């Protein structure tokens, strides 16, 4: 009986690989997550002390997520990820997060905060389903597109991926959460493009999607006020413009080399969400422009290892999975940086691996474990190099 159980377990995990994986993926992930713990302490210790009576309040929660994330990353690094493309698993990966997104609106289960209902709470446990939905979509889209490389040559073949991504976006936008909606929308378009969708089909989707953005902004008064505050935050310095002004103050105060670690001024209740969505502002204040550049260099190195893993992937499914995982991390990092610097209107999107939030941390670390597992199966020049020697399908 025990032997049968071990056989079942070994079907979804692998004890070793002939070719060792790219350990820099694991190292960079752990480094960024560990740096995040330090940054969270610096950004939150004053608020945690005054509000909860414990300056380590947010750090303790993040350390728990860090520990669980390490376990999840270890497990996923040994995962036989090819099992994820099975019909049953791909649909579970898509449908389960959508069910959880629906439960967000059930009274007594969904948790609201700052006018948005984005979390599920059971007892003392809180889960943000939109974080699961991003990777669930990656699994479904990768498995679907990998079944037939020519599937996306017709618009009919594109529709299942479009409907899956659109359904997730719809559930997320009514929370409301426009930032994650944008993230999933960009992820969907990028994966379809990587999968070989024709340019004309890409434009058929892209143009209406871009036209829908201003409609979504106008449809909600709070989004319109945020847009106005983005254009000129000093018109409402104590209202919608306050967050952006304080973020810019933090970055400006940091200068080239920063005020020094743990010496932020803006964390003293001047900058809201300093430990979460706007933690990059505190990092910029304490470590300066040079510190932010170093952080982006490390994040960029992780993205580059993901791109390299995708290029050397053993098959189309592996290529798409690595591409999707890298896109989620890269898109979210870029959007967060643009928001903090005032380059786009403020949205609630955490900086992956660094911002406070266990759901995002654990799932991101788990995804990097899958990326490592894919890198361990790379073969020579990889599937991408072979594919690029052929005439690209989307330009025909």
Model-flagged regions — what are they?
Residues 151-158, 201, 307-327, 383:
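Membrane-interface helix-loop-helix junctions at transmembrane boundaries of multi-pass membrane enzymes
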């Amino acid at each position: 009986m025990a032997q049968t159980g071990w056989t079942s377990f070994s079907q979804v995990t692998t004890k070793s690989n002939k070719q060792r994986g790219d350990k820099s993926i694991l190292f960079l992930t752990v480094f960024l997550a560990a740096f995040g713990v330090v940054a969270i302490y610096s950004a939150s210790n004053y608020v945690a002390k005054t509000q909860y009576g414990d300056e380590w309040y947010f750090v303790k929660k993040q350390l728990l997520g860090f520990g669980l994330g390490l376990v999840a990353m270890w497990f996923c690094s040994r995962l036989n990820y090819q099992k994820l493309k099975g019909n049953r698993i791909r649909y579970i990966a898509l449908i389960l997060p959508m069910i959880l997104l629906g439960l967000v609106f059930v009274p007594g289960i969904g948790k609201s905060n700052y006018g948005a209902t984005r979390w599920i709470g059971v007892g003392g446990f809180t889960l943000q389903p939109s974080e699961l939905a991003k990777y669930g979509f990656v699994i479904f889209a990768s498995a679907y597109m990998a079944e037939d490389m020519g599937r996306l040559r017709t618009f009919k073949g594109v529709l299942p991926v479009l409907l899956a991504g659109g359904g997730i976006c719809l559930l997320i936008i009514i929370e409301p959460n426009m930032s994650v909606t944008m993230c999933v929308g960009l992820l969907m378009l990028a994966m379809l493009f990587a999968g070989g969708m024709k340019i004309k089909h890409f434009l058929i989707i892209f143009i209406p999607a871009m036209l829908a953005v201003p409609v979504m902004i106008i449809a909600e008064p709070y989004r319109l006020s945020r847009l106005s505050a983005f254009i000129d935050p000093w018109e409402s310095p104590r209202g919608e413009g306050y967050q952006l002004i304080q973020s810019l103050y933090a970055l400006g105060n940091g200068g080239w080399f920063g005020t020094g670690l743990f010496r932020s001024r803006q964390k003293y209740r001047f900058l809201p969400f300093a430990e979460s969505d706007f933690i990059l502002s505190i990092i910029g204040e304490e470590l300066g422009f040079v510190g932010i550049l170093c952080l982006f260099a490390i994040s960029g190195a992780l993205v580059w290892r993901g791109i390299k893993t995708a290029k050397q992937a053993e098959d189309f499914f592996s290529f798409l999975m690595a591409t999707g995982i890298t896109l989620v991390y890269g898109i979210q990092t870029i959007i967060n940086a643009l928001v903090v610097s005032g380059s786009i209107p403020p949205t609630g999107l955490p900086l992956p691996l660094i911002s406070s939030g266990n759901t995002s941390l654990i799932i991101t670390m788990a995804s990097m474990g899958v990326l490592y597992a894919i890198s361990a199966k790379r073969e020579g020049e990889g599937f991408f190099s072979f594919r690029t020697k052929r005439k690209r399908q989307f330009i025909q």
